A protein has these predicted regions:
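Intrinsically disordered, low-complexity Ser/Thr/Pro/Gly-rich interaction regions
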Residues: 1-133, 140-161, 166-167, 174, ...
Length: 212
């Protein structure tokens, strides 16, 4: 279509005629279509869901911005999901689209160990130890890439000390706000187990919550 850029908007001039019923209802018409190669991968947050989500990473293929709002997503001409675009996507800008849940990948997070220790002679400190396992099972017949995200507690109180023992640096990325991120490649029908291990130390007379 021909595009007319305004100060804060765009106008599209649709070639040819379009029949729109006179029924006081909104109707959609095709403005433009384009094909673009997308990179498919998976992502999961085991603390929130046991499912992996498929997503497509690509660049905006149109010579005009994709505006914020609701977007319907089709894969191989089949409707798969509705998502919300929260910001304007400029031409050739990177974008990520969720294509829904893939039942061929199962993820489970479970608590393996939790025990309490005490240290000190006169003013004892409490130390709680946690160990979690995240099991990822792929039944796909091809190699896939998947991003796994979880978290561990972060202390903003100088009396509370949190030590992350696993994963080690180099095995995963960690952020200052307690996010752990793994970028994995899984072979066909592979099962992988990730470990999270941390300890929390604090004075015995201090009560804390929200560790799990």
């Amino acid at each position: 279509p021909k595009i007319k850029a305004e100060a804060t908007s765009f106008s599209f001039i649709i070639p040819g005629k379009v029949n729109i019923p006179s029924d006081n209802q909104p109707h959609r018409i095709l403005i433009a279509s384009s094909s673009k190669e997308a990179k498919l991968d998976y992502y999961a947050a085991p603390k929130l869901s046991r499912h992996a989500h498929l997503r497509a990473g690509l660049k905006n293929p149109f010579p005009f911005p994709i505006f914020s709002g609701q977007m319907s997503i089709f894969l191989d001409e089949r409707f798969v999901n509705t998502t919300s675009v929260d910001k304007q996507i400029l031409p050739d800008e990177d974008m990520s689209l969720s294509l829904g849940i893939d039942e061929g990948i199962k993820i489970e997070k479970k608590l393996l160990k939790k025990f309490t220790e005490y240290s000190g002679v006169f003013s004892k400190d409490t130390q709680i130890n946690y160990e979690y396992a995240i099991d990822i099972v792929s039944s796909k017949d091809k190699e896939i890439g998947i991003n796994i995200r979880d978290n561990f507690p972060v202390s903003k109180n100088e009396q509370i000390k949190v030590v992350l023992e696993s994963p080690q640096k180099g095995d995963a990325k960690t952020s200052d706000d307690g996010i752990i991120s793994w970028d994995l490649r899984l072979k066909p029908n592979e099962k992988r187990t990730l470990k999270i291990k941390f300890k929390v130390e604090y004075p015995k007379d201090l009560k804390i919550t929200g560790l799990e």
